[in-house]
Amino acid sequence: MPEYNIEMFPAITPKDNPFKIAEKKGIPIDLFKEGYSRIENCVSAFLSHHSLWEKCYEEKTEYQIFEHDAVCTNNIPKFIPYQGCISLGAPSYGRFETPMKIGVGPLSSKRYFPGAHAYRLKPVGAKTLLHRAKTDARPT
């Protein structure tokens, strides 16, 4: 099993005034208004991820990002071919898209990014996410 250097990152919380942070970064919060979560918590979680995207892009290094409650149930390979960002697992909610055939074929997932609980990110992917956050920020 590959070994990884794991570094805990201090999360942004509602005590940090996430609305002010989002405004300062030019991130709209309109799409965070939904019926399942408290908006302050959603914006805080998003900004925690956003901070790591900034670090990934600035440091020009690949990141693996795990939320505090992510559970690894299998080995994560060192090398995974991907473009900018790839989910490393399956969320505990929603339906999965089942491949139409067994064997080698394209990866299948959901129509949207299947959760932010565990993912790998390249600087080019971080740049894309940072750009999209200016217009399309929503709960992670």
Predicted regions and their residues:
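An acidic/histidine-cluster motif and surrounding catalytic segment
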Residues: 1-66, 70-140
